[in-house]
Design a protein with these regions (language model features):
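Membrane-interface helix-loop junctions and terminal tails of multi-pass membrane proteins
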Residues: 1-169
Length: 169
């Protein structure tokens, strides 16, 4: 919520590759921008990992999720779907300011709460990379979850004028 409130107007608060991918499927972000955002987000995650390892003079220990666990995958996907649903509501209703920050923050909180029942609750592949927990579950599940959550919102609840504007772009 803090990032939405502070940098949302400047950059759209693009700090999560899963959310960026979901917005791209809704045609809210042009393909070149989505690719640049995702590359920058992953570079940020890798940089954070490198800085922490340098400053602490030790390797960051991974969370230990080296195998595909269906429960963890489902928890990460469902948590990110909830988060993506909230972000889609903000974007498609054109919410701004504290209303946008609260909606994004609340959906992130609920998403992490759900995901944390069986998973680390990253909901963000760049954060998983920064935590040295980059694997199929922490990359694919949030991507799928965000895409599903955003498209469910778009299909069932999006205001008609938000659908028209996304098709013009």
């Amino acid at each position: 919520a803090t990032l939405v409130g502070t940098i949302g107007k400047v950059s759209g608060a693009h700090v999560n590759p899963a959310i960026t991918a979901g917005l791209w499927t809704l045609k809210k972000i042009p393909t070149p921008n989505a690719l640049i955002y995702i590359a920058a987000q992953l570079l940020g995650g890798a940089s954070a990992l490198a800085i922490v390892e340098y400053v602490t003079n030790s390797d960051v220990v991974a969370s230990g999720m080296s195998t595909m666990d269906g429960r963890v995958f489902l928890a990460e996907a469902l948590g990110t779907a909830i988060f993506g649903f909230g972000v889609a509501a903000v974007v498609m209703q054109k919410l701004e300011g504290m209303q946008a920050a609260f909606t994004v923050g609340a959906s992130l909180f609920l998403g992490v709460l759900v995901a944390a029942m069986a998973a680390p609750g990253f909901l963000n592949p760049a954060v998983a990379l920064a935590n040295n927990s980059w694997d199929r579950t922490t990359v694919i599940a949030p991507l799928l979850g965000s895409i599903v959550g955003m498209n469910v919102y778009s299909f069932f609840l999006a205001p008609a004028d938000s659908l028209k504007s996304s098709k013009k772009k």
